[in-house]
A protein has these predicted regions:
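Generic non-transmembrane alpha-helical segments
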Residues: 143-151, 265-276
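A translation/RNA-centric and nucleic-acid-associated enzymatic feature enriched
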Residues: 161, 171-271, 282-462
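Structured alpha-helical bundle/scaffold domains in large eukaryotic membrane-trafficking regulators
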Residues: 277-281
Length: 462
């Protein structure tokens, strides 16, 4: 049985082939007097393969009825193309129509807005733009695993259902099998979660960090890469309710080592995509963001500037720039502040470190000044924050005080405190939002357009 050849492989051929089988979807059909041109795409690459179907073919009448979107299997010869724009084309000997597409097929040969394509998310991967997005997404995921595996990290699967809130933000999706119309109650009238499936309140995870810390304190270097969930009612272009996170954790690692790895990681991902997704990136640079390639190279070519939070606030305050949100010590930097630092002041990526303890989670290591913690955020041009991390608090007594300050019950984190009781060790880690990185390397401005089926407030279609 003849094996099908991907379009990408056929186009990259170095010699003609007497027999080839290609399968895919018709992008366009053009009829001449004695033959038809078919543009065939199978998603393996951006370009389509031109097929010449002669009028002498026994089912030529069926071929002339092929609409955009129809699926076909074509057997023929791979020959040098007589036309411009492609090196090879297929001279068809048989054209089998696998699945017809009627005239209502919404992806006709014209431009479509991202807003329209979000409404047909089940079909939009067939468009040029979204085919590119999801090929880059696939390659980026591969590059992530490659980076950590080559450096001796162990890949850990952390739980999706959890009883802890790593960030302490309270923006959690609850998981329950209780009857919502008539839940069991305790004597005080509160819902009795002891009768729930897990016999306690449980949620979809917001982070795998705490569990990853447990494994780092045994395997030294680990990373997680999986879905996370936030019930944050933010209907913006940067927020989604379901997204993927990469979270490495390293034992015997301080803030300096953490910042070094984060910078190396970001550059590796950009370099890999620039090397392996050149054709797709060219489309983004042409139609999405004309500054994309220069911005990616800009990040690759420069060391990241490092500045303390205190210094960053002073720079922003003295800049004279009018911000929508005022700059003040003790508040989180807004996206406009982050972009000012990277795009106008330093003109390069920036790592901000040592934040006030009041605005960071309980697990971050307290500095000797008793005012700041060893937090760090990596900021890049065009996006702002792309990585957030810290050295973790390894001292049991200090961690317990941090939990009290954040009004967390130590009983809920007994296992986490055990990591400090039994062979504690300095350790660090960070989180990179996968979709945010994908937005950065493609120039796509809305997170809904880099997720296969976006989950946002008020929307869980498909």
């Amino acid at each position: 049985m003849l094996k099908s050849t991907p379009v990408k492989e056929a186009l990259a051929g170095t010699a003609p082939r007497d027999v080839i089988l290609v399968q895919g979807w018709v992008r366009t059909r053009r009829d001449a007097k004695t033959f038809s041109f078919l543009e065939l795409n199978d998603g393996s690459c951006l370009k389509s393969l031109q097929v010449i179907a002669d009028a002498a073919l026994p089912n030529y009448a069926d071929i002339q009825r092929l609409n955009t979107g129809a699926s076909v299997a074509i057997r023929g010869k791979l020959v040098a193309s007589q036309g411009q724009g492609q090196k090879w084309e297929v001279k068809a000997e048989t054209v089998d129509v696998i699945g017809a597409a009627d005239a209502t097929y919404p992806l006709q040969k014209k431009g479509h807005t991202p807003e329209f394509l979000r409404e047909i998310a089940h079909l939009r991967p067939r468009s040029n733009l979204f085919g590119c997005v999801f090929r880059v997404r696939s390659r980026l995921a591969y590059a992530i695993h490659q980076f950590f595996q080559e450096r001796g990290f162990v890949y850990v699967h952390t739980p999706i259902v959890t009883g802890s809130d790593c960030e302490g933000a309270g923006e959690l999706f609850r998981v329950t099998t209780l009857d919502l119309q008539n839940p069991p109650k305790r004597e005080d009238g509160a819902i009795d979660y002891a009768k729930d499936f897990f016999a306690r309140p449980t949620y979809l995870t917001v982070s795998g960090q705490l569990e990853a810390e447990a494994f780092a304190c045994a395997l030294s270097k680990v990373y997680t890469f999986g879905p996370t969930f936030r019930a944050e009612n933010s209907n913006t272009s940067r927020h989604a309710s379901e997204f993927w996170m990469i979270e490495p954790e390293m034992a015997f690692c301080d803030l300096q080592g953490n910042m070094d790895l984060a910078e190396e990681f970001v550059k590796h991902l950009i370099r890999d995509v620039r090397t392996h997704c050149a054709e797709d990136l060219e489309l983004f640079a042409k139609f999405v963001d004309k500054e994309l390639l220069s911005r990616l190279d800009f990040v690759l070519d420069r060391p990241f500037q490092r500045v303390s939070y205190t210094e960053a606030v002073e720079l922003l305050t003295k800049s004279g720039h009018k911000f929508e949100y005022p700059v003040a010590y003790g508040t989180n930097l807004q996206s406009e502040h982050e972009r000012y630092l990277t795009e106008q002041h330093f003109k390069c990526p920036v790592t901000v470190y040592n934040y006030p303890k009041e605005i960071k989670p309980f697990y971050m290591r307290l500095n000797d000044d008793d005012r700041t913690v060893t937090a760090m955020d990596v900021l890049v041009p065009g996006i702002g924050e792309i990585i957030g991390g810290s050295q973790r608090e390894e001292r049991l007594d200090v961690l317990q005080k941090n939990m009290e300050r954040h009004q967390l019950d130590p009983k809920d984190y007994g296992w986490y405190l055990d990591l400090r009781r039994y062979g504690t060790v300095p350790h660090s880690g960070f989180g990179l939002g996968f979709e945010r990185m994908l937005m950065f390397v493609t120039g796509v401005a809305n997170i809904r357009d880099v997720v296969p089926f976006a989950r946002t407030p008020g929307n869980a279609a498909f």
